[in-house]
Amino acid sequence: MNKTPLPNLETLEQKWYVIDAADQRLGRLATEIAMILRGKNKATFTPHLDTGDFVIVINAEKVTVTGKKRQQKVYRRDSGRPGGMKVESFDKLQKRIPERIIEHAVKGMLPKNSLGRKLFTKLKVYAGAEHPHQAQQPEVLAINTIPAGGN
């Protein structure tokens, strides 16, 4: 009986990628980011190991959604106290904390366990075009989230 080869975590190379979120669709962008964070784009993917890469997202303030989601999509947070639920639309949250929109979308696509929390720390989201990770020499990754017959 053959054994499944496991990747050696010491020799595993983790790259840094920069993704520009300007005029990209939120859900499709988050799907691609989650796949890279998990390492599903690599031949060495193992479900229970951290084989993914680091992702830097810039221009988070310019991410788009289709239809009426700009006004109708809501984000909820709760203080835990009676009557402490705060509801905020996509449009208002994008003006206030644009990074949180992409973080929320990607976090929902990662495993809900300790590995998922570890993978989430490898995501760096910035509202503007600048990021402080030049020392890691990130590779620019072009993602097209607008469908061919899209609007």
From Swiss-Prot:
The keyword Ribosomal protein applies. Pfam families: Ribosomal_L13. InterPro entries: Ribosomal_uL13 (IPR005822), Ribosomal_uL13_bac-type (IPR005823), Ribosomal_uL13_CS (IPR023563), Ribosomal_uL13_sf (IPR036899). GO terms for molecular function: mRNA binding; structural constituent of ribosome. The keyword Metal-binding does not apply. GO terms for biological process: negative regulation of translation; translation. SUPFAM superfamilies: Ribosomal protein L13. Part of the 50S ribosomal subunit. This protein is one of the early assembly proteins of the 50S ribosomal subunit, although it is not seen to bind rRNA by itself. It is important during the early stages of 50S assembly. This is Large ribosomal subunit protein uL13. It comes from Microcystis aeruginosa (strain NIES-843 / IAM M-2473). The gene is rplM.
